[in-house]
Amino acid sequence: MSSNTHFTPLILAGIAALCGLSVANVYFNQALLPVFAGAMSIDAGQTSWIATASQMGYALGILLIVPLGDRVAPLRLCRVLLAWTAAMLLLASQATQLSFLAGVSFLICMGTCIPQVLLPYLAGLATAGERSRVIAWIQTGLVIGILLSRAIAGWLADHLGWHSVYWVAACVMALCALVLPRILPQRHAPGIPVAYGRLLSSMLHLFWHEPLLRLSCALGAAVFAAFSAFWSVIAFKLMGPPHNMNATEVGLFSLWGALATLLTPAAGKLCERFGTVAISLASIALCCLSFVLSMAWANLFIVLLACANLLSFALQLGQVANQTRIFSLSPESRSRLNTVYMVCNFCGGAFGSALGGYLWLRFGWTGCATLGLLCAVLAMVALLAILRPRSKQLSVV
């Protein structure tokens, strides 16, 4: 397959849009948590379980489904996942209780692992020199989907009720299932002759024997925990004094973070120029800075806007660096490498969402921001600890 033929900007833009629309299902409920609290007469700590269930469902979907990308044609697998997600979204629109909505959110997000099926597939088609650029395109779509989903969900909830968000999302997934064959060229999967059980168990072997995979997992989980802690409680922060926003305004706040995604293609070029270690260091430093600023000036709206932007770009930098690193390890195992990385990533996200909600109830914004800062500091310590004895090894990836 020629990369000049199949990785035109138009093709990559279409795939990035598909990935963004898919991953939006994991995150749009974060803008609705205060709405759920009012509609179901529950507190902020309880609503955080909806976000946590979503991320855990996504992680389990990645763990159980994405490894099939080493065996099954991506087009067929993605169409099945899109149909499943659409059906579960319609079911969620009928929810009246927290437990039911959290359970169905878990099932929705199990099927929303489509971007993680496509990422290793497309990375395998890319040349080594353009791999970072391809990953950066897809990461741009993912983060735009994450951030715009909150804005759109907030607007729909204010004007049509929260049930309408799920109806619209179901229709979008059904449309994506129809459009997908026109965007994604159908190619045969590698067809590794390994039983499904052995395919799953082989991921433990990869994790144990690939130090760069373990490093990427640790960095990704820590930064994503910080990112999730911020976004799981920011709606409560903005809806309370002194900001007193409504759901639409909270959703629009997320649009500021979307500006950072305009820089994501540059992240791919920076990664190719300076290496993954330097980009990982920059990612963690920006994450630390965003939480320090938000703790110092939590009641200044402009500071929170700036922090959202910094944090989004930090996440983008880290993801591009980490996935460039792991996709260089073993060409025949890219889906499983990505599975291990993303499961760790979203377990970190679930941890950040759950603990962020708890700390918000106990200590307010200071507790949540402290959690984010600690996660970033731990990531920095881990990277520096491994970098010292292995600087020559790490500098080449």
Language-model regions, residue ranges each:
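Helix-to-loop junctions at the C-terminal end of transmembrane segments
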Residues: 62-73, 262-276, 360
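Intracellular juxtamembrane helix-capping segments at the cytosolic ends
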Residues: 114-126, 317-330
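C-terminal membrane-cytosol helix-exit motif in multi-pass small-molecule transporters
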Residues: 171-190, 382-386
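Juxtamembrane intracellular "pre-TM" segments in multi-pass secondary transporters
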Residues: 2-5, 185-217
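Conserved MFS/SLC helix-loop-helix module at the cytosolic interface between two early adjacent transmembrane helices
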Residues: 60-98
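Helix-loop-helix hairpin linking two adjacent transmembrane segments in secondary transporters
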Residues: 137-182
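Cytoplasmic helix-loop-helix junction between adjacent transmembrane helices
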Residues: 105-142
